[in-house]
């Protein structure tokens, strides 16, 4: 399925991911991850990108974020990943690309916000690295379960309004449907919004673009050909 030009929706959650170039281990040690998290904290706060959740793996990263300004997502990742690439190349006496292309992202409705956050925090569990999400120290799960400090610029307000440690533990323990995992991956890869038909229709009306997958025939022409569509919704 073709990848859409990126859609950034102010005050709407997004799932975001990016891999290391050639899937190389760019976050292999605790020292590298600490450098990365310090940069991430700096730039999400500077550019007003609310960080609701994250997970750092050895060769890729996942986030659930809410941009509070039109360029918050692009600038935060551009500067975090640019500065980290300079650090990593210097530390490894290397040169060239550290990150694989541009990041992937998709807007989320209110239900899929939590589905995506669960998906992000269960990443190390699916990979067989830990038995429970909170055992992985380099994700937001540690803060959500009270075993780590939200020192990465993590925005806990929305999570606290909806969850407690006990209810979040139950939600993660309930597991993920394969259909949910597939939907998150597909929408993130293509850039299509993940949500109800009503949610997607709202975004289509605002962007003047066809965002729902077409059912065969000739593909519809986008009505807005900008590289990135920026919307603003009320908080």
Question: Where is each model-derived feature located?
Answer:
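Glycine/serine-rich anion-binding loops at beta->alpha junctions
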Residues: 60
């Amino acid at each position: 399925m073709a990848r859409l030009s990126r859609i950034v929706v102010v005050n709407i959650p997004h799932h975001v991911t990016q891999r290391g170039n050639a899937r190389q281990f760019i976050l292999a040690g605790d020292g590298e991850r600490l450098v990365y998290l310090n940069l991430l904290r700096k730039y999400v706060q500077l550019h007003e990108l609310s960080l609701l959740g994250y997970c750092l793996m050895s060769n890729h990263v996942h986030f659930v974020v809410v941009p509070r300004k039109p360029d918050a997502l692009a600038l935060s990742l551009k500067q975090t990943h640019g500065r980290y690439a300079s650090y990593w190349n210097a530390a490894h006496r290397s040169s060239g690309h550290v990150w694989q292309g541009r990041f992937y992202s998709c807007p989320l409705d209110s239900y899929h916000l939590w589905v995506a956050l669960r998906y992000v925090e269960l990443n190390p569990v699916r990979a067989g690295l830990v038995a429970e999400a909170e055992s992985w120290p380099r994700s937001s799960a540690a803060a959500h379960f009270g075993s780590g400090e939200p020192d990465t610029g993590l925005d806990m307000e929305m999570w606290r309004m909806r969850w407690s440690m006990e209810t979040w533990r139950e939600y993660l323990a309930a597991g993920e449907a394969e259909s949910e995992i597939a939907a998150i991956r597909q929408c993130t890869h293509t850039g299509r919004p993940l949500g109800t038909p009503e949610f997607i229709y709202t975004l289509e009306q605002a962007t003047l673009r066809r965002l729902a997958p077409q059912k065969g025939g000739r593909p519809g022409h986008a009505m807005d050909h900008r590289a990135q569509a920026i919307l603003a919704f009320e908080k």
